[in-house]
């Protein structure tokens, strides 16, 4: 396993980060297997773990807490806050009220006295950044949190957070987590340049594009049983409705993916790689990327990913990928991750008045 610095924190983290979104009732309900995946990842050299308060309604944090018991000092532990995690009006967001409450819930579930990287799970545009960063800075001062970050934020928001932190002398975000894959290269336009400018870390989520780049899908077959495309038809899809669009085969972008897959598989074969290993290594070829999040749901999936940990793409392979899918390209809009609230139909014209 190779390691990279997390921005300018001086902390070294593994090039691959273990994602736990599929742990618990929204994914793998076999707690023992989930714990075994964590142990296997740690044994393989992964020292960076990603989870969130909303993954399986907090169950993922609980499982991670059990899994790292006795090995906590070997782990750079990241979790998130911001998305709705309760029935109350204030059980979400970037307010001091919610941050101070939810960090205690996460610490309890994770069975730890501190979180290494506490990330805001998408921007909260209804709350002043001074409010959010002030509360988070207090957590750093208290020792409950070591570093701060955000997830799936646009470049302008990253710039604003850095400015507010500097002007108000508050702790800064040291990491951004966004979707980045061969099919989702939009972050190459503005997000990754911003990350490099501010010397932040960058962790890439969905490097396999939700399973599209594993070789599971083709235009000639239905989604394999247990795959994300299959599971979004059930309760999991209801909990994460955007995932239904990501696997809607009638959408033009998804149809284009089906057309591109054979060509990508050909590029991988020429490089002596599987499509999955080429895809999981792809984000690491960008200088701004710190770590790539892999979220195996089963031991079998982890074993498949593990075999590609040492893969490093060469220039000819990267050139072939660029020729097929240009830098900065987003194939399917549903994969973007962050959607401006002003583009959501329900709020697009909420301030409009009159009948003209």
Walk through the language-model features, giving the residues of each.
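Short, well-ordered coil/turn segments that N-cap beta-strands
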Residues: 11-16, 45-47, 71-75, 112-116, ...
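Aromatic-lined glycan-binding groove of carbohydrate-active enzymes
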Residues: 187-239, 274
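Glycine-rich beta-alpha junction loops
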Residues: 81-83, 154, 180-184, 206-217, ...
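N-terminal binding-site loop/beta-alpha segment at the start of enzyme catalytic domains
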Residues: 1-75
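Terminal-tail/helix-coil boundary detector
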Residues: 221-266, 270, 285-290, 299, ...
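Conserved, mostly hydrophobic/aromatic
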Residues: 6, 18, 34, 49, ...
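Glycine/proline-rich, positively charged
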Residues: 26-27, 39, 43, 86-190, ...
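N-terminal small/glycine-rich loop or linker at the start of catalytic domains
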Residues: 8-26, 78-91, 114, 119
